[in-house]
C-alpha cells in the first residue's frame, strides 16, 4: 500500500489503493485528508488539500465570551500581561500573525504554547539560524526506498500554530519562504500547492537589542504581521506569583483545551 505522512499529526500512513485520491480518515488523529501518491501529484500537479474544519456562525457576544474563556485559560500559565494576551487572541480571531520584539526569557514561547493548547491546535517551534534553509521550514521531497519515488515530507510550517524564534537570524531566502504561507495560507513546492490547515498563525520573535549576525526584515515581510507586541519583564509581584505556580508542576504541562480549532 502507498505510504504517506499525515501533516496533522506527523504519523506515517498506509493508504489502501481504493482510497487514493479520495478523502482518507487518518487512524491516528481522526482528521480527513486528501492524499494522492507523490508521483501522481508531481506528474499531474494534483493539489493536496486539507478539508477545512466545520464553521459555525457565532454572534458577537458568543465570540467575546469565547475570547474571554481563552484569555482566562492562557493566564493560568502567563502571569499578568493581560493587554498583550488579549491582543494576541484578537490577532488569532482576525487570522493575523504576530511579531514579538523583546529580549529573551519573557515567556514568548510559553504564550504561543498556551494559546495553541487552549484551542487544541498543533504547535511547532522553528529556531532560526543563518544556515537554516527553506527546506528545513517548508519540507522537502525525499526518496522513499520502498517505492523508489520521491515523497514530500512536511516541515514544521505545516503546524497550525508556528513559533518562529529569532526570525531575523534566518537568511532573506528563508524568510521569503514563509511569505506565501503567511499571506495565502498555502505552500508551493515543485509546482505543487499544499494548503495549510486553519487556523494558521505565525508568532515570530526578534531581539531588538542584539543586531549582530541578523538580517533586517524587509517591508514585505513586516506587512504580513497584523500585530507587533512586546511582553516586557515581570514586576516583583508577578515574579513571586510565577515562583508559587511552579512549585509542584509547570502549568503549561496541565493546561487543558477550552475550545477547538473550529
Please annotate each region the language model reported.
Residues 86, 93-95, 106, 119, ...:
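Short loop/turn elements that form and flank the Walker-type P-loop nucleotide-binding site
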Amino acid at each position: 500500500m502507498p505510504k504517506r505522512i499525515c501533516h496533522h499529526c506527523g504519523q506515517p500512513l498506509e493508504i489502501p489503493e481504493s482510497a487514493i485520491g479520495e478523502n482518507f480518515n487518518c487512524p491516528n488523529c481522526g482528521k480527513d485528508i486528501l492524499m494522492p501518491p507523490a508521483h501522481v501529484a508531481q506528474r499531474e500537479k494534483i493539489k493536496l488539500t486539507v478539508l477545512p474544519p466545520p464553521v459555525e456562525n457565532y454572534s458577537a457576544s458568543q465570540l467575546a465570551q469565547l475570547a474571554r474563556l481563552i484569555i482566562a485559560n492562557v493566564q493560568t500559565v502567563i502571569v499578568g500581561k493581560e493587554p498583550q494576551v488579549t491582543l494576541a487572541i484578537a490577532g488569532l480571531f482576525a487570522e493575523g500573525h504576530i511579531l514579538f520584539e523583546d529580549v529573551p526569557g519573557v515567556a514568548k514561547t510559553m504564550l504561543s504554547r498556551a494559546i495553541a493548547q487552549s484551542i487544541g491546535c498543533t504547535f511547532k517551534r522553528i529556531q532560526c539560524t543563518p544556515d537554516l534553509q527553506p527546506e528545513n521550514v517548508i519540507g522537502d521531497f525525499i526518496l522513499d526506498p520502498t517505492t523508489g519515488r520521491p515523497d514530500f515530507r512536511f516541515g514544521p510550517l505545516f503546524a497550525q500554530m508556528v513559533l518562529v524564534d529569532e526570525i531575523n537570524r534566518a537568511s532573506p531566502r528563508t524568510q521569503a519562504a514563509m511569505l506565501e504561507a503567511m499571506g495565502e495560507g498555502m505552500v508551493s513546492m515543485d509546482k505543487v500547492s499544499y494548503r495549510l490547515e486553519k487556523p494558521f498563525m505565525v508568532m515570530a520573535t526578534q531581539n531588538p537589542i542584539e543586531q549582530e549576525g541578523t538580517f533586517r526584515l524587509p517591508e514585505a515581510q513586516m506587512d504580513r504581521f497584523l500585530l507587533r507586541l512586546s511582553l516586557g519583564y515581570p514586576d516583583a509581584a508577578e515574579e513571586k506569583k510565577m515562583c508559587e505556580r511552579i512549585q509542584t508542576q509547570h502549568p503549561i504541562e496541565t493546561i487543558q483545551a477550552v475550545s477547538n480549532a473550529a
